[in-house]
Amino acid sequence: MSSTTKPWAIISGAGPSGLLLGLLLAKKGIPIQLVDMSYELDKQPRATHYGPPAMYELRRAGVADEMREQGFFPNGVSWRKIDGTFLAGINVELTSDDPDRMTCLPLNKLGKILYEHISREPTATVSWGHKVVGLGQDDDKAWVDVETPQGPKKLEAEYIIGCDGANSQIRRSLFGDFEFPGKTWDEQIVATNTYYDFSPYNWEDSNFIIHPEHYYMAAKIGTDGLYRITYGEKPGLTLEQLKERQPMKFKEFLPGHPDPSQYKIVNFSPYKIHQRLAPSMRVGRFCLAADAAHLCNPFGGMGLTGGIVDVGGLYDCLAGIYEGLADPSILDKYAEIRAQKYNEIVNPISSDNIVRLNGQDPDKALENDEFLRMCKRAETDHEFAKQMQGGVNALKHDFTQYYKKKGTQNGSTENGDFLKQHHLPLQAAAAGGVNA
């Protein structure tokens, strides 16, 4: 996009959600500008697992093949006791013919792929070092006030989208710094990226360990032996105390009870976890998507998959408006339905995912936990297993049905009733993407 062309949409946040939305819009020929306060792409791996609804959107953007070249297909998921005893699992190989099969790739690598693609789009501009400090709108336009290396600027567009993460300045400016309804969990979580040899133990690529104190997740996130090991800790500890306790924790719960000489930690990130939803995902010409709009605990990767599905739905709405196929009121549908998906699917199921690990007796888990019993059934009933895994599509929604003319049916709720009926965790969640 030339320096004199006014963008039709401005996207705040050049992380993966903002880059994906920008790429989808730019591929339609829509002039867009991304602004980000950073001066480069985020280099942290963060989340890693993309469920089928997310891969559908990434395939629409034309990046799925490159993701799979650089990443891999996880082979399955298990729930275990702390001694490694297998309780139940999900065989994702049953859906190996799905064009949107779950894929694992660190988020920073996806960001690089998306940035390379959007850089080739003539209607897209990415402006680094642009910090949003204020915003406004009237009947004709919306704007953001930004601090830039060249001084303060006022940037205008028809629509402005906040894809600027959990600490979203767009959301804060719309609703106030502390207006993000929901809760913060008492649990202290520590996410690590660790090289450790799990091969002697014949575990799946993603594993959840049920224990009241030493619950954790171990998920393969690379083809070079790198695992995301994320575990629960005592609340109230300092960073130094958490680091001091880490060798004890690993020796206590990892298979083989290793000493520090037997593994290599390359990233150590303690954080608190939240369940929160913005008061609205639309205010006039402003919209929110992904972490800027809602948060959930990371056990299950539902924040990543759900956020990408937000972006795909918002793209269909904005593209419909731009092409004259939809009225601006379609954005009210976006805000309503994406909030509904959070409240009915993402929030309760992601909450169940962590309570399943630390809120029950592992010796009675198969007896008391309906989901684990269903996983056991699915081990021998493959048709039932496919229905379970297909339930993930309940996250999707076809916003083109609200076009004035018949849309392209970009979205599906296939098997969604099954998911709601059985209150199932998404298989994307089961793979254990973690935002560290």
What are these regions (language model features)?
Residues 2-17:
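Beta1/beta-strand and adjacent pyrophosphate-binding region of the FAD-binding site
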Residues 26-47:
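Glycine-rich FAD pyrophosphate-binding loop
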Residues 119-133:
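A conserved beta-strand/loop element that lines the FAD pocket in flavoprotein oxidoreductases
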Residues 116, 134, 139-143, 147-153, ...:
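Conserved FAD-binding catalytic core of PHBH/FMO-like flavoproteins
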Residues 68, 125-127, 181, 266:
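General small-molecule cofactor/ligand-binding pocket signal
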Residues 43-46, 50-119, 136, 220, ...:
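Active-site-adjacent segment of FAD-dependent monooxygenases/related oxidoreductases
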Residues 5, 317-436:
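C-terminal helical "tail/cap" subdomain of flavin- and related membrane-associated enzymes
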Residues 14-23, 27-31, 58, 114, ...:
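Conserved mid-domain beta->alpha element of the FAD-binding
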